[in-house]
Amino acid sequence: MSSEPVPQAVIDELERVLVNLDKSNPLSFRYRALFSLNALAKKGDKRAVDAIYKAFIDDSELLKHEMAYVMGQSGQQYAVQPLINIVNDLDQQVMVRHEAAEALGALGFTESLPVLEKYYKEDPLAPIRETCELAIARIQWKNGLDKNNEKITPSMYDSVVDPAPPMPDHEQDVKSEVAKLRSEIVDQNLPLFYRYRVMFRLRNIGNEEAVLALTDGFKDPSPLFRHEIAFVFGQMIAPASVPALIKVLENTEEVPMVRHEAAEALGGIANDECLPVLKKFSKDDVRVVAESCIVALDMIEYEKSGDMEYAYIPKVSA
């Protein structure tokens, strides 16, 4: 999309598709509208944030969690209050409230701290408490309270705001560093924020030993931590992670937020091993898992089609 202000008619059409009041649009098409609104939100368009927020009346846990993620990636302080409203809304699904809290951490504004501290102390649900813990730590880090002049090498992932920054550069050789990080990622005595930083440093290293070290994270007792491991594998598009991701998706005893993230990661990798399992679980009894597989398959179909643009860009009259 160009740098010129987008006509209101385009915003209105994207909002219409995303909110889907008439139930006429399939989930995959609504994702494409969200993709367009994401691009506009990142350019500072407040109308895109407003359009996304209106769709939180929907009942799709998957879509709402993705909308919260997009708001967190927008960089807009304007998105803080809508996200606070979502965290405060106890009728929203856990995965949606978690993503809204994480989004507040991604935005990094100190005005979010009171609500995050409240639910870190009071929420009965561990994923919410842990997310708030991470978001608080990230806001403190971003605002210079805990940076200590760290040297962090730029990476290919810098366009995405992570729940925690990667660990700073290490003096050790890579093999020794990965061995150290592999022991730390599973060390329950270390703070959660520290272990998340370990996770993202391993992602940035990105070799096969780092992938195997990250795989150990699937043994963690925290569903939140396990789901982030799957998310990271989706970012890395690492074929070496496929067996572990398939195992997670196939495990019907695993919590939905972890299985859903494994499905999305498999969709990103999209090799021959991924397709059959995604097709199988697109009919899963757990809605968020089934929908994740459906969206993943749609993305794969788009990649195969050779289309230049995944986003839905409305054509409106001048």
UniProtKB/Swiss-Prot annotation:
InterPro entries assigned: ARM-like (IPR011989), ARM-type_fold (IPR016024), Armadillo (IPR000225), Deoxyhypusine_hydroxylase (IPR027517), PBS_lyase_HEAT (IPR004155)
Keywords linked to the UniProt accession: Cytoplasm, Hypusine biosynthesis, Iron, Metal-binding, Monooxygenase, Nucleus, Oxidoreductase, Repeat
Gene symbol of the encoding locus: lia1
GO biological process, one term: regulation of cytoplasmic translation
Record's subcellular location: Cytoplasm; Nucleus
Binding, Fe cation 2: 227-228, 260-261
Primary localization class, coarse: cytoplasm
Organism from which the protein derives: Schizosaccharomyces pombe (strain 972 / ATCC 24843)
UniProt lineage: Eukaryota, Fungi, Dikarya, Ascomycota, Taphrinomycotina
Cofactor binding notes: Binds 2 Fe(2+) ions per subunit.
Pfam families (alphabetical): HEAT_2
Catalyzed reaction equations: [eIF5A protein]-deoxyhypusine + AH2 + O2 = [eIF5A protein]-hypusine + A + H2O
Protein's recorded name: Deoxyhypusine hydroxylase
Enzyme Commission code: 1.14.99.29
